[in-house]
Amino acid sequence: MVSVSSGFKQRGSIAAVFRCIPFDIPSLDSLNVPPLLNTLILEKRGLILMVGATGTGKSTTLAAMLEQRNQQLAGHILTIEDPIEFLFSNKKSVVNQREVGRDTQSLQIGLKNALRQAPDCILIGEIRDRETMTSAISYALSGHLVLSTMHANNSYHALGRILSFYTPEARPALLADLAAGLRSIVSQRLVRATAGGRVPAVEVMLNTKLVSELIEQGDFSGVKEAMEKSMAEGSQTFEQDLARMITQNIITRDEGLAFADSPTNLMWRLQNDMNPISRVNAKKEESDDQPTFTEITLDVRPDNPSTRSASLTRY
């Protein structure tokens, strides 16, 4: 299916940008994304944000996640999109897709009426403003699974963008609600593969107890540090995923460095995490080369007739 992304006039002529959207929704396994996404989409409640730049495959990954839920769980999936991209058919779930301008007058009106339609899972096409963000958090706190996209470079930048929607007076209440309602922020970038085509590099921030406390305090730099030091259980940074793909020869080192948030951090991981077994063997070889003394014999001139040659054995 071909979708017109944008139509415009230039130099007196008509121009357009088209997007090719496949009819068949890909599976999560075929996209080379973390297996964790298979379980995240089956959650009963919470807010899951998919963030990244334009054209990084956010919509494709979200569609694959929704199809996973559609195939495995009975329920009602409601999408409010501008425009509709992937088309779903009912499987274990009933999927209703509403397009802004065609099925609902505006995104806000569609969201206002969403709870009356008894959804279990709600997909919001994109969060661009405070009103949409407030609705997404509110629905997550009321027991629904909410999915949406945002434009941000990574997880902690997404947190900063969410905060920027609100006035300083409203931010403490927002942070408390976000800490309680957020389930995960998934960031994605498309990287050229050595075998051709592109593969996603994925950062996952899970809202663990530690991350929740840091969000409530507004300490977003602390969230970044917790992820880098693997203190946020289940989370992974771009550098961790890029290092994995470089090690498995899925991408080149130069390509990984170009897409890393911190090339220095990625180089450190490649040097220290790639071959832990070889480092252990190297240490063992070094220890084998060192001189060892298992038996020491002391031959002492006896100043006292009672003094004798002593033999000391060390084990």
Regions found by a protein language model. Give the residues of each.
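Short, flexible helix-loop junctions that flank or precede catalytic/ligand sites
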Residues: 1-315
